[in-house]
Amino acid sequence: MPRSATLVIDAQIGSMGGAYEGSSVIKAINKTISKVRESSGVVVFIQHCHSSYEPLMKDNTGWGLHLDLDKSPEALVVEKESSDSFYETPLDDLMAENDVEHVYITGIQTEYCVDTTSRVALSKGYSVTLVSDGHTTGDSHILAQAVIDHHNKVLANLAHPKSRIRVAPSDEL
């Protein structure tokens, strides 16, 4: 029977520190995790391994998953080095092994790993929901809220011959 998965992208101690509305986003991620678990889905925590950015170097304190995430022993963990959570990782194989057809995308950073993973998941044939209140970024030359709003709109309107990315808040999943 087809299942769903929550992908929690890079919600690590070192990346969530300066995140816009970080605690609210963690709550939305946990809500999404709970919904997927209730329907016998799977949860995948994806951790970015960075070779030169110390907070995300493997096994540093900042590399660990955010302490407020609803983790459980049965959750899957994937390590990546790219903005694409599927690139040279076992993620696609794990999805196949668990009969996953639908993915809920959450995490950080909206304009990098969240965006890229959403697009790649769609191209790989998954049904994709971007949790609109479950992803974030930090302020840069563009305010974080503007980046989030922009990506929610762009990804919802992305052209694809077989499917679209659904964008919905955690309360409407």
Residue ranges with predicted function:
Residues 7-8, 45-46, 131:
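Generic enzyme active-site microenvironment
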